[in-house]
UniProtKB/Swiss-Prot annotation:
Residues 88-119 are annotated as: Disordered. This is Aspartyl protease inhibitor. GO terms for molecular function: aspartic-type endopeptidase inhibitor activity. Aspartyl protease inhibitor. It comes from the Eukaryota. Residues 88-112 have a biased composition (Basic and acidic residues). It is found in: Secreted. GO terms for cellular component: extracellular region. Pfam families: Pepsin-I3 (PF06394). Residues 1-15 form the signal peptide.
Length: 228
């Protein structure tokens, strides 16, 4: 039973949308997952990554109630599917013969979709920008866990532009790394020498298409100054 429950939690974690995560030097941009990270509601008060945001409105409380019901139904469905898979696996291991139709495993894409997050919990609410000396979340500057100030309108626009350019830059860097690793190990031909006859392999590795002009790493916003 514990194994099934663990599988349910893993399925939920992998099915859920991935949080944004960027890094640049001493800066980390992350949506945060697990524990007090992300959105948490207790006593009708909304928290994001451990920081109190506000009280939920009446309509948002109803939205939360509906979400809790959908999550319960989703967990029950995933648990039932995993239980059926476990029973089929036990039957195979015990040597029982079953018809092909009976032993056909459920594909991952056939798993139920997790419920959509409530409208009051968005990526803008949970994304954190860690700079050298401070952190920005929800257009608010924090020093440690202490609220310092709100970003002004110009700083908000600067942060949006930085995030946009940094995303493009990191995607380019990621492709460069993939290409270098592929060239280093010779693509599929390298691994085929271990798992088959290399001379019979016809698969070739196509290098990722990279932009002719590499994007520049964006300048880091100066929202705080660390004194060394």
């Amino acid at each position: 039973m514990k194994l099934i429950e663990l599988c349910v939690l893993c399925a939920i974690a992998f099915a859920a949308p991935r949080q944004k995560r960027l890094t640049v030097g001493t800066i980390a941009v992350t949506g945060g997952v697990g524990g007090a990270s992300g959105c948490v509601v207790t006593g009708n008060v909304l928290y994001a990554n451990g920081f109190r945001l506000r009280e939920l409105s009446a309509s948002e409380q109803q939205e939360l109630t509906n979400y809790e019901k959908q999550v319960a139904e989703y967990k029950a469905s995933v648990k039932q599917i995993l239980k059926e898979r476990q029973e089929k696996l036990k039957s195979r291991m015990s040597g029982k013969k079953e018809e092909k139709a009976a032993v056909t495993s459920t594909k991952d894409e056939d798993l139920p979709k997790p419920p959509q997050k409530p409208s009051f919990c968005t990526e803008d609410d949970t994304t954190q920008f860690y700079f050298d000396g401070c952190m920005v979340q929800g257009n608010k500057v924090y020093v440690g866990n202490t609220f310092a100030r709100d970003l002004d309108q110009n700083e908000i626009e600067e942060l949006k532009e930085f995030e946009k350019k940094q995303t493009v830059y990191q995607e380019y860097v990621q492709k460069q790394i993939q290409q270098q690793v592929s060239n280093l190990f010779g693509g599929a031909d390298f691994f085929s020498s271990f798992f088959g006859d290399a001379k019979d392999q016809t698969t070739t590795t196509v290098a990722p298409v990279l932009p002719e002009d590499a994007p520049e790493q964006p300048a880091v916003p100066n929202f705080c100054t660390r004194i060394y």
